[in-house]
Amino acid sequence: MRLRNKPWAKPLIEENPDFVVTEPTKLKGKWHTRFQNNNPIFVEIGMGKGRFIVEMAKKNPEKNYIGLELQTVAVGIALKKQLEEKLPNLQLICANGSGLGEYFEKGEIAGIYLNFSDPWPKKRQTKRRLTYKTFLEQYKEVLDSNGHIEFKTDNQGLFEYSLVSMNNFGMKFDGVWLDLHSSPEAEDNVMTEYEEKFSKKGQPIFKLEAHF
């Protein structure tokens, strides 16, 4: 979803290079130096306004988190949250998620989160879905040997497509939930802004966890 332009967003990002990376290719293979520790790194692709990734970083200080988002306005909103918290284990990237293999070295990431990604419903848009095989190839490259993917959506069509796509790619499923908020998994679930909005309307939330 495209957000309305906020003139303050770009200057705010430029003023905070300690929290926002605008040239991630320069840190490929060096992310642990950015965090100044060797803790595992988890990346959310398409973090939106940043609620999920900020909460995850607060909840798990022993892990490092990176929120990746293309929209400058969304990064600006997420940055405001980070400026309030100043979490040492959280970094933001303002860049396109399709370049993941250019930002991270092989095996540099421990986990990937895909939350409420654009479903790109038209057939000609299939290749743009974040669970299309070319994206899965990138994920496999940058994830370590124990790395996993967590995927959440309210879109049943995208969920079913993703199950098939991952299965065809040879991935193994560690868990599949057709109504996340009605399951025991809901107790430890960290919600995104969209997730809270959809669930309040009674919309079931689909989730899967998988590895290569």
Swiss-Prot record:
Q: Which GO terms describe its cellular component?
A: tRNA methyltransferase complex
InterPro entries xref list? SAM-dependent_MTases_sf, tRNA_(Gua-N-7)_MeTrfase_Trmb, tRNA_methyltr_TrmB_bact
**Which Gene3D superfamilies does this one have?**
Vaccinia Virus protein VP39 (3.40.50.150)
**What pathway does this protein act in?**
tRNA modification; N(7)-methylguanine-tRNA biosynthesis
Origin superkingdom: Bacteria
Keyword set, alphabetical order: Methyltransferase, S-adenosyl-L-methionine, Transferase, tRNA processing
Which residues does S-adenosyl-L-methionine bind?
Answer: 44, 69, 96, 118
Q: Which reaction does it catalyse?
A: guanosine(46) in tRNA + S-adenosyl-L-methionine = N(7)-methylguanosine(46) in tRNA + S-adenosyl-L-homocysteine
PANTHER family for this protein = 3-DEOXY-D-MANNO-OCTULOSONIC-ACID TRANSFERASE/TRNA GUANINE-N 7 - -METHYLTRANSFERASE (PTHR23417), PENTACOTRIPEPTIDE-REPEAT REGION OF PRORP DOMAIN-CONTAINING PROTEIN (PTHR23417:SF14)
Similarity comment: family membership = Belongs to the class I-like SAM-binding methyltransferase superfamily. TrmB family.
- Main role? Catalyzes the formation of N(7)-methylguanine at position 46 (m7G46) in tRNA.
What is the protein's name according to its record?
A: tRNA (guanine-N(7)-)-methyltransferase
Tell me the organism: Ligilactobacillus salivarius (strain UCC118)
**Recorded name of the encoding gene:** trmB
